């Protein structure tokens, strides 16, 4: 018999939510006095995973409630309004075992729609739960609720969850998701003793809507057409900004976050990059990093002094704490990879790795120095899999035979929107994604329709088997991290230039246990071939995980087994998300030009509302 574990996180709601049990109708929100009243909780200690968590193959149900609200927070010393889940910044850690069913009740207390995506989880058989507005669902309306329910099948490792509505992820709606398994190649107690999460994000002092609106103007954001690098780097929710640059008298310098690790142990550090833009390089003074996982795949990897990590990627590394003594402290340094951050500034986020034991915990800052062989400011950006061999510990050679190959040409340039206006943006195959947010593509295919349109680049794998996805990054010198939903892929080939279908047979592919990932860094002017198994019917997003590029249209879809999708049925609550909405309305994006198109649910559900054009005042002066 399946057990049930219910985990309810309590928070201060900023709007009152009237439940369906009380009224018999869909929940509605009361927006009276809608200013933030709570101060978000920032507690880096929650990222130390407990050894008391039972890793078992007996499935259970793990139930959570997520209240999405606004709050005030000063994660880097500068106070701003943030979005939070259960008043936590970052949001709560989800921890489960392979085979468990995860249920998450999401209550949206914001003034705009929301959704939650479970980054890296395949959603095998539950495509309706992938959490992408306009692709797999309609957004959760303001003041309403939706329950995500799915079983974690045949996966373990390091994942995360985040909002997939516009780029509101960058405002604080994200958190770790850890899946254990007694059959995982990496075993606690054998391969490592302790488990810690290192959750890394960039942090901008303006709300994401302000940034998106500014980028749509000729002046750009702070005078630049490029997305922001970030005002600070946050590690487990804390960072240090340049208070002088903010012009705010209330700005403070909070202490760096601490990661406590026992002495004489092997500690697994799970690095998660939730950043909206930069690639980061992570290093720990005096501690080599043994790479043992990438994107949920346990690997035999190198031992390095520095790990490059792209937006959306995850890496686990093991460090040895037997060389020091209780009380020793070392700097963990996270720096921006300037080789792919044009016009960027040298920026380092710091955390303290401190050895603990049975005595008093020291509060002294480390006196350690960085490794002498770290990447320089002009070092080109490259994924760790490009520089080193990452061999999956569970060996799985790529299928020799494949049914189809499809090409996505990734481009930046001029596109034409549905109103006939030309705009600068990103896209695939000469199409910049324009999101009909109340007409999900999954629903269209379920009804027997097609994703082929001028609104989104798409490709279809009709049958069970294996196939190739070729991505040509034609964006000149601009690198991108690409994330594929619903699938893990095997990286079987890379090269410079562009690869056509005609030249595919001339490539010597690596089919012998290639690395398996779901997020991949692809340099400008290069190509990659991904081998996938087409066993998961659904409409799956393929997009750049630089959130600002996504709002500019850097998204395509991969349709797998459309015939099988026609026999799938989502829950009634999923269908009801689209009730009383306009299927022709477009969701928020950097280049959405017409504020007149709205959902018919105008009283509470204004996706293209006036906030896109309003001025939001900062609490401090802009940088010069």
Swiss-Prot record:
It comes from the Eukaryota. Induction: Induced by copper. Transcriptional induction by copper is dependent on enhancer region II, at position -1792 to -1614 within the 5'-untranslated region. One of its GO terms (molecular function) is hydroquinone:oxygen oxidoreductase activity. Cu cation 3 binds at residues 164, 485, 543. The keyword Secreted applies. Its main location: secreted. Residues 582-603 are annotated as: Disordered. Glycans are attached at residues 242, 320, 430, 503. Binds 4 Cu cations per monomer. This is Laccase-1. It comes from Cryptococcus neoformans var. grubii serotype A (strain H99 / ATCC 208821 / CBS 10515 / FGSC 9487). The gene is LAC1.
